[in-house]
């Protein structure tokens, strides 16, 4: 859709490529995080498919945190070890680091309430989370679509990259 392509292109200064879409069917109550830790160079388009409010788990963001420090996999490597699950590594190592950056930034968190069909665009460095769901079991359908610039050399996965024209390419990482 040109309605999404144009603002993404304007933000990137380059053509966007889709790299991942996730469907949240209820509020996630996800810890604070930065998408670029997982998806280098990304920007997110969070599309509400239902009304999103405090009852069903609003998106929470720290305004201005996209200008702050990015936690990278060099800072906090998560490895597949038998002694500790990936989820435990995030809980014990990654999320506490994000909380430190959150405090460094010094800005308060705000809730984002949206109507069905609204799109929230945000930088992949923005610290965000899912708020507590007040009405358990209430639906909160949202798509979290992640994009990177066409020229991105920082993409570290062998996933397909799909343009808004439907062209699919895989830019394989080097083994260097």
Q: What are the functions of these language-model segments?
A:
Residues 1-62, 66-68:
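Conserved double-stranded beta-helix
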Residues 8, 109-113, 143:
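Extended, compositionally biased low-complexity polar/Lys-Gly-rich tracts
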Residues 31-42, 107-108, 114, 138-139:
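A short beta-loop-beta micro-motif enriched in histidine and acidic residues
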Residues 38-54, 113-116, 121, 146-151:
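Short, conserved beta-strand element in jelly-roll/cupin
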Residues 54-127:
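Double-stranded beta-helix
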Residues 75-78, 116-121, 125-176:
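Non-heme Fe(II)/2-oxoglutarate
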Residues 41-46, 69-74, 84-88, 145-148, ...:
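Glycine-rich loops and low-complexity Gly/Arg-rich segments
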Residues 41, 58, 71, 131-133, ...:
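Short, function-defining helix-loop hinge/capping sites that tune catalysis or transport
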